[in-house]
Amino acid sequence: MFKRKKYVDNPYPKFVQPKNHKKRPAFIRYAMRCAAQTDVARNELYYTNPLKNPITGCVLHRKRRLNEHRARALRAVVQAMLYYFNIASMLVMASVEKLSDVCGLSTYSSAGNKSITRASRLITQFMEPMGLISCEKIWDKILGMYIPKIIYLKPLFFMLFDISKIRLKRVRIKQLEWINSQLKKKGEYPITLLEIEKQAKEKHIHSALLFRKSKYIIKKQKNKAKKFLELDEKYAKSYILNNLVKKYSTKELCKLGLTKLKRKVNCEYFRLKKLAQLPVV
């Protein structure tokens, strides 16, 4: 008898606040409560508002309602988007990968390769065509690839849990007034909502580039560790020992002693072993 393949890896995704959790503004906390108390996956707006291609604007034919797995993913992603939402700029200050991770939607293959398909398809095939969000892709000429897409929340997103366009506008103006009052205290000039949006966009791009750079460094170190561990253990430890000896003076080596030096060699060997086993993100 054949065992049925799992439809999804995590059938009950849930948004989990990061460990370095900071208290979010009152409006965001209120919006998260409203979204949690409303079934955002089963809303009449989905039946009155047709799916549209975000590039061409053509109406897309919808065959069926959201299946339960995608509905659960949507409920989790809505919470995550609100948590990372910047009120004044309307930007979600997190990448699709970050949203996927905090909602438990990311999966890993047997080879350790990371997949965020479940979250990215929800965003590109449903949330964006429905008009809940809009996404912007920016091409990095230096790296020759796209920077993780910038996500903007649209008024329709908030209408899912009964926050009107007028109320959202009022909250944004209030936030702008607070930002300008802080700038005034510093002796700086006031700014507009458009300038805030531009600054938030630049911050998102900068963070994305830093994250990509750190991923590249880790990958490079991992590949180096893998190649190193292909060597015989005795030879590998001998190589580590020679490198450690170069770091210390004769006086420092005498003070360190043979036992402590051996312990340092073992620690470095097992650190490289652990690094080589890290999943590819």
Swiss-Prot record:
Pfam family, one: IncFII_repA
Keyword ATP-binding among UniProt keywords: no
A GO biological-process term: plasmid maintenance
Highest taxon in the source lineage: Bacteria
Record keywords: DNA replication, Plasmid, Plasmid copy control
Family from the record: Belongs to the IncFII RepA family.
Classification via NCBIfam families: RepA_IncFII_LM
Protein name: Probable replication-associated protein repA1
Gene: repA1
